[in-house]
Amino acid sequence: MDYSNFGNSASKKFQDDTLNRVRKEHEEALKKLREENFSSNTSELGNKKHYRAQERMSSPLHRLSPTGKSDDRKVKSPLDDKLRRQLREGNTRLPPPPFSSYGMPPTNRSNLDRIRRRTSSPVRTDKFASQNVIDDQRLEIKYLERIVYDQGTVIDNLTSRITRLESFILNSISDRGDKNFASLEHSRSFSGFPTNKTYGLQMGGLYENDMPYRRSSDNINKEGAREDRSSQIHIENESTEDILKNIVFVFSQLN
């Protein structure tokens, strides 16, 4: 550097002396660091030194202790010999401490406290909060699936009861005798609500071309007109009171 214009003429000599002294101290410090780095890569580490090289990895209080007072050290370094030798020969960096070593010692806290301490950052808190929302939604889905399953079970039970009721109605009608054979045939054709397919209705309604209502085209010759048949269970000829009486009778027989 050119120090010709550095300061005025009165203090120039003092400044030059100061700069030279600082430069000389800096060069000596660099030379000392080079020698120390070179000697740390040799197998004779620590023979010509008053302090051990391993103490650079220890706490500051142990670092100041001389070689002769090594017995005063409380605990030995947790690093094994192989890792310590690698650190001496290759100047490798120390591995990061385990997560539980941050803050207070792990022996004074439970695992739950350490987990809470790990998740104290805002990012991790948001992450775990979203995970809690996902878990709640999964529980709600399972709850809804349970409700659907229960409703399906109820529907299955009702279906089985309706099937039993229909079979009981058919059996009770068949026990009335041969005089109600036509009504028995009619009742077997009824399953559920009346539809066009069930009763074989014609396009013109109950009467078509001035002919009375018949069951279907294939039964015209076998069956007579409905108004000529004597039946006690024709739905279109029975009153609401008779239908309710039959239903009450069927339920009383089931119970």
From Swiss-Prot:
The gene is SPC29. MPS1-mediated phosphorylation at Thr-240 is required for spindle pole body duplication. The modification Phosphothreonine is found at T18, T240. Component of the spindle pole body (SPB) required for the proper execution of spindle pole body (SPB) duplication. Links the central plaque component SPC42 to the inner plaque component SPC110. Belongs to the SPC29 family. One of its GO terms (biological process) is spindle pole body duplication. The keyword Phosphoprotein applies. Residues 1-20, 31-123, 210-231 are annotated as: Disordered. GO terms for molecular function: structural constituent of cytoskeleton. InterPro entries: Spc29. The keyword Metal-binding does not apply. It comes from Saccharomyces cerevisiae (strain AWRI796). It is found in: Nucleus; Cytoplasm, Cytoskeleton, Microtubule organizing center, Spindle pole body. Pfam families: Spc29 (PF17082). This is Spindle pole component 29. It comes from the Eukaryota. Residues 69-91, 211-231 have a biased composition (Basic and acidic residues). The modification Phosphoserine is found at S65. Component of the SPC110 complex containing at least CMD1, SPC29, SPC42 and SCP110. Interacts with BBP1.
